[in-house]
Amino acid sequence: MFPKRQGIIVWLHSLKYGKQLRKFGNIHYISKRLKYAVLYCDMEQVDHVMKKLASLPFVKRVEPSYRPFLKLEFESKGEKEKDSPYPLG
């Protein structure tokens, strides 16, 4: 139903060119102080978009976001681990 998306972090020399990043994907955030932008595009196009972005003169470097590849479901502690031998308080 929804396409798989991946974030791309783009480090810029100047924020003046931030609007030009719109044609490469959806801009999620632009940091004025650190001069970077986070944009999202389809996972199938990530390599192609990263190569295009890296070739632009106002881009310092381009990094992919590894969030889609991380396990985000965490397990709760077992009953044995919950009971601490040292009481608190």
Swiss-Prot record:
Superkingdom field: Bacteria
Sequence similarity: Belongs to the UPF0298 family.
Annotated compartments: Cytoplasm
Coiled coil location: none
InterPro entries listed in its UniProt record: DUF2129
A Gene Ontology cellular-component term: cytoplasm
Keyword hit for Cytoplasm: yes
Source organism per UniProt: Geobacillus kaustophilus (strain HTA426)
Disulfide pattern: none
Protein's recorded name: UPF0298 protein GK1096
Keywords, sorted A to Z: Cytoplasm
NCBIfam families registered for this protein in UniProt: PRK02886.1 (NF002777)
Key word Cytoplasm present: yes
